[in-house]
Amino acid sequence: MGILSWIIFGLIAGILAKWIMPGKDGGGFFMTILLGIVGAVVGGWISTLFGFGKVDGFNFGSFVVAVIGAIVVLFIYRKIKS
């Protein structure tokens, strides 16, 4: 899946990650989007790295990977910030 697809997934994944893990994070909506994009890209890369198959296209599996990646990045961001 191209980087543009991961950015779009990241936008949505960031919003969902924030919804799943509510809390006060600096940066507001912009930070949520940025963490979602980073999480989606990292999630896709890790999924491929660990042999879960190539994540490509707009499908449910890719979306789940993007959301999980965004949640992990949000968790790490909060741990570093606190």
UniProtKB/Swiss-Prot annotation:
Pfam families, per this entry?
Transgly_assoc
Taxonomic superkingdom: Bacteria
Q: InterPro entries per the record?
A: Transgly_assoc
- Keyword list, A-Z: Cell inner membrane, Cell membrane, Membrane, Transmembrane, Transmembrane helix
One GO CC term, this protein: plasma membrane
Q: Where in the cell is it found?
A: Cell inner membrane
Its membrane topology, per UniProt? Multi-pass membrane protein
Primary residence: membrane
List where the protein spans the membrane: 26-46, 57-77
- Asked if Membrane is a keyword of the record, the answer is yes
> Which family is this sequence assigned to?
Belongs to the UPF0410 family.
What protein name is recorded for this chain?
Answer: UPF0410 protein YeaQ
- Which organism is this entry from? Escherichia coli (strain K12)
Give the encoding gene's name.
yeaQ
